[in-house]
């Protein structure tokens, strides 16, 4: 939008909220609300305190749209100002600023028949003599002074010349010699809609290296859930091994994954191409990245040289001079370090890390007054500059003041361990290990990484006994919610392992590497941890996931996950994962249900487990029990995971109704089917607009027909024919279930329309035959899937089972029972837990 506002207005309360920000940095604006159907009303109930309408107003800074991102370069600062403010009485705001909101509309006055403009102005402050001016194509139409304020709303109707078009009008509000807000309607025209986003092509289909690079960058920037940038970079390097951009990009990718040695050659290759003709390249990013990588490798003299060469280029000077200053400070070359940091700050005076280092260097050089001024300026610029906060405390001589300052700083840091770790890392970066340890000791939480880092720094200071004690504390800490993820953590945890920490440190480092896709290292580390202490359930659980998903060893996965559950039989998450593994391994529904029945309280502790429990009841024919369990609980679905409990609700009632039909209890069947058509509130879900319920209406027609209610039965059969006759992959909750097409056909048969019926049955068979050998994969833009993604899914195999199921449905419709049975059998051989194939096989 080229306007600087977005808002929402409650016409019942005559009030609303506005967001105002410069559209050059906040171009994207979104208003979202659920619809008024059953599905939307259910989400209103879930997401609001008093079950009223749910509306999202969304804006972003430096982003055009909700899923769009922008880059934040090393040490870069992006600043913006935005205002959230209330307003009232204006109705539909046409333009707004932080000072005022205005509405302007033109319409025929029903009383006089004259064309009239209506102006409404709301101000956020008191303006006693504001001027409101309305102009048309021939000049001023209205000019009046009035008081406007949050309680004095200006409203006026102005009669317009007959030939006035709305776009000829302009309203402006002036006060104190300036314009508060203005608005001129734009000529109505059909806006040009942007093209929808396109999925990335496969690397081999992309023509140029530039496009391969940009696609890889896009996937990285958007942190795509299922696609990786690696194939795009590797394809580019296959075509041109010395490509500068791709070597830099792939080197950075490897470095961010902790593969420092593997990353180095890519930066050196980029430098080789950069200096092919000119020893002093136009852009020296590769030198900077090489310097950073060498720092992680501990080769600091080489890193210093690389940073110095990078500093020959304007774009890399801020970062390079900062790191050179830090490396010089580590060698106690404080004068040199100060020169470097001053040059870094020339490029970005707001670099808080550099400012903190400068204050520390000034203090080291005995320039106390200059250091004090620097600290004061730093804290004025950023009160959350914890390095400067600690420097201020160190410089204070009055013990009472010192304690008060320390208390205030700890209040700002909230005793949140990451704040202390971040600050300690900053100090350690320039060799201030003593300061780093003092910072870590301020946090009173018993958090493992605080002690591991303290030990690492204590060892650097030569305090071996202190380091040993810190390592002992780290190993004995509770591991809950400790998930190291920083590249600096690698060296710290490696040091801990090398110094005898074999129980927990390998576990933490294994987690870090698994997140960074280094699963072989993860498995080795977790196995080391398991050998040191095999009573830690999470280690066995992690190994199970890696064995199944990364090594293809389902037996080892089963062994480890069963061991994990045996160590903590009250861990519902581990039980959920174990059950999903049993499902993958082809355990029968009865076997799985028996394990749930051993301790129902586990399933009751989680919605996802409880829904699986109910599913197993239905699959084992315990429909009444499943229904009782459904009605005895309030469910809380997640967006994208809808449809699970409603499916089980429908299955339980439909299958009970089928039993009633078989035993000629037609009235009872009718009641059950009518109940199935309405979702009770406790399910937490409403019915999606467009849901056809063909299976329910077909069986309801049978129940009514058996009672002699032929007209009502015919209406039900007609309703059961409605819906698309195109089968789909059935991956998402809003996909039409395939058997709805079967019931369309069966309903057409009941209505005597054999041709329409057969066309449905053959469509199911044709789709199955045509797509049987398709390669299955997750759709590029998918952000949420309804199924648990604990263990890797073979979507090609899943697609084949689905196609066999579709062909079975088509043959059921055509009365080819033997063929149908064969296809159902094949579907269940491929996917033993196929729910719908199981239900139809029973019939």
Where are these regions (language model features)?
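Structural marker of alpha-solenoid helical repeat scaffolds
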Residues: 239, 272-279, 313, 347, ...
């Amino acid at each position: 939008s080229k306007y600087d506002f977005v808002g929402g207005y409650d016409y019942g309360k005559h009030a609303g909220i506005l967001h105002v920000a410069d559209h050059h940095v906040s171009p994207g604006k979104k208003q979202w609300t659920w619809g008024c159907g059953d599905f939307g009303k259910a989400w209103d109930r879930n997401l609001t305190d008093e079950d009223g309408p749910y509306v999202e107003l969304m804006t972003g800074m430096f982003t055009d749209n909700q899923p769009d991102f922008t880059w934040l370069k090393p040490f870069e600062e992006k600043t913006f100002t935005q205002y959230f403010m209330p307003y009232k009485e204006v109705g539909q705001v046409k333009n707004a600023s932080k000072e005022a909101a205005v509405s302007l509309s033109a319409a025929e006055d029903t009383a006089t028949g004259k064309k009239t403009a209506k102006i409404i102005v709301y101000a956020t402050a008191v303006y006693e003599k504001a001027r409101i001016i309305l102009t048309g194509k021939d000049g001023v139409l209205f000019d009046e002074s009035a008081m406007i304020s949050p309680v004095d709303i200006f409203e006026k109707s102005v009669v317009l010349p007959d030939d006035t078009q709305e776009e000829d009008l302009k309203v402006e509000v002036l006060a104190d010699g300036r314009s508060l807000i203005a608005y001129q309607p734009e000529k109505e025209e059909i806006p040009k809609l942007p093209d929808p986003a396109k999925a990335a092509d496969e690397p081999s289909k992309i023509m140029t290296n530039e496009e391969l690079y940009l696609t890889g960058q896009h996937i990285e920037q958007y942190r795509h859930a299922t696609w990786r940038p690696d194939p795009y970079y590797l394809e580019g390097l296959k075509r041109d091994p010395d490509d500068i951009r791709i070597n830099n990009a792939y080197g950075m990718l490897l470095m961010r994954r902790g593969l420092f040695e593997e990353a180095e050659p890519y930066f050196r290759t980029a430098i080789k191409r950069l200096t092919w003709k000119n020893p002093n390249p136009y852009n020296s990013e590769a030198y900077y990245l090489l310097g950073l990588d060498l720092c992680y490798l501990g080769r600091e003299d080489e890193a210093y040289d690389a940073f110095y060469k990078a500093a020959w280029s304007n774009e890399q000077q801020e970062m390079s001079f900062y790191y050179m200053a830090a490396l010089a400070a580590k060698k106690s070359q404080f004068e040199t370090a100060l020169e470097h940091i001053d040059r870094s700050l020339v490029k970005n005076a707001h670099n808080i890390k550099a400012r903190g280092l400068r204050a520390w260097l000034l203090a080291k050089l005995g320039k106390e007054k200059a250091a004090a001024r620097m600290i004061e300026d730093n804290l004025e610029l950023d009160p959350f500059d914890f390095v400067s906060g600690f420097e201020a405390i160190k410089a204070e001589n009055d013990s009472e003041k010192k304690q008060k300052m320390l208390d205030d700083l700890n209040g700002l840091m909230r005793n949140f361990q990451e704040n202390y770790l971040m600050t300690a890392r900053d100090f350690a970066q320039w060799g201030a290990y003593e300061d780093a340890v003092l910072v870590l000791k301020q946090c009173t939480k018993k958090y493992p990484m605080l002690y591991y880092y303290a030990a690492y720094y204590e060892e650097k200071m030569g305090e071996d006994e202190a380091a040993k004690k810190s390592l002992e504390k780290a190993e004995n800490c509770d591991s809950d919610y400790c998930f190291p993820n920083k590249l600096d953590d690698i060296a710290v945890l490696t040091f801990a392992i090398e110094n005898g920490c074999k129980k927990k440190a390998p576990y933490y480092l294994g987690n870090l590497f698994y997140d960074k896709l280094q699963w072989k290292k993860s498995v080795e580390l977790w196995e080391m941890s398991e050998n040191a202490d095999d009573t830690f359930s999470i280690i066995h659980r992690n190994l199970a996931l890696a064995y199944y998903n990364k090594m293809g060893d389902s037996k080892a996965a089963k062994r480890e996950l069963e061991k994990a559950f045996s160590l903590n039989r009250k861990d519902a998450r581990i039980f959920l994962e174990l059950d999903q593994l049993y499902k993958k391994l082809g355990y029968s529904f009865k076997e799985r249900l028996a394990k749930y029945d051993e301790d129902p309280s586990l399933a009751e502790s989680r919605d996802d487990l409880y829904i699986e429990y109910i599913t197993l009841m239905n699959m084992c024919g315990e429909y009444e029990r499943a229904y009782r369990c459904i009605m005895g609980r309030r469910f809380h679905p997640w967006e994208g995971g809808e449809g699970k409990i409603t499916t089980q609700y429908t299955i339980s009632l439909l299958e009970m109704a089928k039993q009633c039909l078989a035993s000629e209890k037609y009235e009872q069947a009718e009641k059950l089917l009518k109940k199935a058509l309405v979702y009770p509130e406790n399910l937490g879900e409403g019915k999606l607009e467009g849901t056809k319920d063909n299976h329910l209406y077909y069986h309801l027609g049978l129940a009514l027909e058996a009672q002699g209610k032929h007209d009502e039965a015919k209406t039900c059969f007609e309703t059961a024919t409605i819906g698309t006759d195109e089968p789909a992959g059935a991956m998402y909750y809003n996909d039409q279930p395939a058997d709805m097409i079967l019931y369309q056909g069966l309903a057409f048969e009941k209505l005597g329309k054999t041709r329409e019926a057969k066309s449905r049955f053959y469509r199911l068979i044709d789709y199955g035959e045509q797509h049987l050998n398709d390669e299955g994969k997750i759709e590029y833009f998918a952000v949420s899937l309804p199924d648990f993604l604990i263990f890797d899914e073979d979507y090609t195999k899943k697609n084949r089972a689905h196609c066999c199921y579709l062909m079975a449905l088509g043959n059921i419709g055509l009365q080819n029972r033997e063929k149908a049975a064969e296809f159902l059998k094949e579907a269940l051989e491929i996917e033993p837990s196929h729910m719908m194939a199981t239900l139809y096989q029973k019939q």
